[in-house]
Curated annotation (Swiss-Prot):
Record key words, sorted: DNA-binding, Metal-binding, Nucleus, Transcription, Transcription regulation, Zinc
UniProt protein name: Glucose starvation modulator protein 1
Function as written in the Swiss-Prot or TrEMBL entry: Transcription factor which regulates nonfermentable carbon utilization.
Composition-biased stretches (Polar residues): 105-114, 154-172, 260-274
Organism of derivation: Lodderomyces elongisporus (strain ATCC 11503 / CBS 2605 / JCM 1781 / NBRC 1676 / NRRL YB-4239)
Residue ranges with Low complexity bias: 66-79, 91-104, 178-188, 621-652
The encoding gene: GSM1
Amino acid sequence: MTKRLTPQEKLSRKPASRACTFCHQKHLQCSNERPCKNCVKRNIADQCQDITRKRVKYLTGANSKAVAAATTPEATTTTPKRKQKRSVKGSPSISFPSSSISPINTSTFDTNGHPNGHPNDLLRQSLEASQAGQAQAPSLLEIQGPFPQMQTLQPTHTVASETSSSYSQVQPQHHPESSVPPSAPPESVDQLQQLMMHDSAYFNTNNVALNPTNVLEADPFDGHTNTMLNTTTDVLNKLLNDHYEIDNILQPPDDALLVDQQQSSSEATGTSASKAVPMGPSHSNTHFSSNYLNEEYLMLGDILLQSKPTSPSPSNTSASEYNMLSPSYTQNIDFDNIHLSKRKVVQKLKDSRPFISLGFPKDSSLSLDNLNNMAHQTDNLLDNNVSSRGNNNTSNQKLQSAIASKTSKTNPIINFATKYSTEYVSPLSTHQIYQTVSDIYSKDVLNYEYPNSYHALTHFLKTRFSGNNLPHEEKARKRQNLLVILKLIASYRPTFISAHKSLLKPQDLLFLEMSFQRCLIDYEKLSQLNSSPTIIWRRTGEIVSITDDLLSLLGYKLLDILSKRTFIMEIMYDDESIVKYFQLFKSVAVGNLHSSINTKVKLIKNGGAVPGGGTSNGKYNYNNNYNHNYSHNNNNNNNSNNSNNNGMSTGAGNSGDGDGLENNVGTNSYIEFCSVWTVKRDLFDIPMLIIGQFLPILPAGDGVRMY
């Protein structure tokens, strides 16, 4: 009985890389030294040898298994009877003693020693002779004379293994348990078929001479064990050895004759030629026997050869670390013809199966001339003529006539006369141009200049936080807030710039603007179905859409907001709301892909006073073209009328009559909202537009429940 090990011995012992034959059969813990401890303890140290590992089925053929089983001495000397019966079916190794060989008629063989008759004809003759009661075996079994090496029916060509240092020599061996008496007839038809299969295998493989040129090389995957973990390793090894496949593409292999002989021998022995994998470098065309591994190999080849990082996100900065090749592989690369090799491999992958190429081909047929046809085709396909914006009664007739004269339905998507135009187009104008989805594809697309928008934003921030006519302490505090905001903008804007540097100008920029207008139409339809007041603005902060109920709450008109460049920060009441906005936007601008923000914000009413001086009407007078002055009393009356028309709750104010109606929501200067911001990103994962929904916080009083 095996001695029980102590816990200390179990921790100190190390597993062996390969067990010996005895330990493998007895399921014992083997050691690395030879002879191992178990064999020394049992006095069988002379028989301690490494076990021959079982090879993976899809890396070797049935013919090579038969050769290995026939040339291994242990297969006929030390194996049990049960394993010998199993080896008879897969790898025949039956031999005859010299005393059982009788003269043979040489007329049945040609000059090269091959039988003239077909094995099936010989088998038919043997069956007829056995049925007639003849006492002798068929003439094919009576072998002597010019074939002395046929006394052992073993193939003469061998396969080089890991441990062999010289070519193996075939020696005649006698096995009494498998020999057949010379005068005994075959007992059954199965025995005759087995004997004939042995003889045909010998005659098909005997014509290969035993010399170094005909000895096959070792398979490069011979060291792998039969585990599922090695499938990925095999795929990567094949990817790193693509220069063998390039050689096979350029010229046929030198050992084509040897492969044909092996295939013919495998067909004669009854094995399927489709399952036999040729050994050596010429096996690259038959990748794997598994369709899953073939697909994995082809997909890895596509990724390694044609993929490239296209996003400036931090996750792609370390992609080059995984694309490095080992030094052993670079030694085998021909740097003179390296581009030719890559083209050969790519062409081989294209010929292997149809796939979608990762990246843009150099000979792309997509030109600017085809974009006109694409515009007409898209105009026919998109029949969404329902406008989500409608005609505004507040817009001027002159503005509509100017827009109608500037754009027409027959213009292409890209107008080369205006593609480099930097003229600013207000959101109200774009609402009149793109009223339906079909208008985006049929009318001229105007490019949006983000740098000019950032310059206007910087000018507004400097004006807002200038702190004129304020004490020194208040002015220093405003300047500190301005520095915080500028640092936040500088943290994410370089990423936006780097993402746009790789674009094809102006086509990609126009495509991004088309995507923006397409999403804007959908979100405006959604805001009409939603009861909450909504504002939609770009990533620069410029407002592009606002609902009527929010306009009525704040006392603005649509022309006041959308007829010029108006930022969301302009209608924020205090400096803390502006600083908090940039902090929240910086958190979702780069890296973090969260799409919603919950916060509180104070929005200025029309005509309300801003802390630190100034009013909301003039926006600090930084844009004098659209400076609208309204009196405070008129604003209050407009607020009350708009609130009554939209069904909002209003208060009677201090006086009980209807002369001085005021908006009872918020204060006279601002309204505090609970807001939810939804971030919509473009194809670079950069915020494209932000949808803000604002719910006013009602004041506490009689009839108002507080939570």
